[in-house]
């Protein structure tokens, strides 16, 4: 259960870092300072989101597991009960 959550967070962090790297201008010092402030704010928000995501339990996972197991259950019922 921890791997998908951490993978999701890693994808977001990599996506944000890539977009910030591409958007950073090199010639304008004011724009560089603004980009640095934006990067720091994004890093802080990402850290808060990670802490919040790791602190909360996932109430939807049992329901999601049930929904993903329905085709398997249907196949088992058809194979064992209906077709004998």
Swiss-Prot record:
Q: Which residues form the signal peptide?
A: 1-22
Q: Determine if Magnesium is one of this entry's keywords.
A: no
Predominant place of localization: secreted
Superkingdom of this protein's organism: Eukaryota
- Describe, from its UniProt entry, the tissues in which this protein is expressed: Expressed by the venom gland.
Q: Which molecular-function annotations from GO does this UniProt entry contain?
A: sodium channel regulator activity; toxin activity
Q: Which UniProt keywords apply?
A: Amidation, Ion channel impairing toxin, Neurotoxin, Secreted, Signal, Toxin, Voltage-gated sodium channel impairing toxin
Asparagine amide modified-residue sites: 83
GO cellular component, as recorded: extracellular region
Is Secreted given among the entry's keywords?
A: yes
List locations, semicolon-separated.
Secreted
Propeptide feature ranges: 23-59
Role, per record:
Toxin that potently modulates mammalian voltage-gated sodium (Nav) channels, reducing the voltage threshold for activation and inhibiting channel inactivation. Is selective for tetrodotoxin (TTX)- sensitive channels. Shows activity on hNav1.6/SCN8A (EC(50)=285 nM), mNav1.7/SCN9A (EC(50)=352 nM) and hNav1.7 (EC(50)=403 nM). In vivo, causes spontaneous, gradual and long-lasting nocifensive behaviors by intraplantar injection in mice, as well as noticeable swelling of the injected paw. Does not have effect on insects (blowflies).
Additional free-text comment from the UniProt record: Negative results: does not show activity at hNav1.8/SCN10A (EC(50)>1 uM) and hNav1.9/SCN11A (EC(50)>1 uM). Does not exhibit hemolytic and cytotoxic activities on HEK293 cells.
Q: What does the similarity note say?
A: Belongs to the formicidae venom clade 1 family.
Q: What is this protein called?
A: Myrmicitoxin(1)-Pm1a
Q: Which organism is it from?
A: Pogonomyrmex maricopa (Maricopa harvester ant)
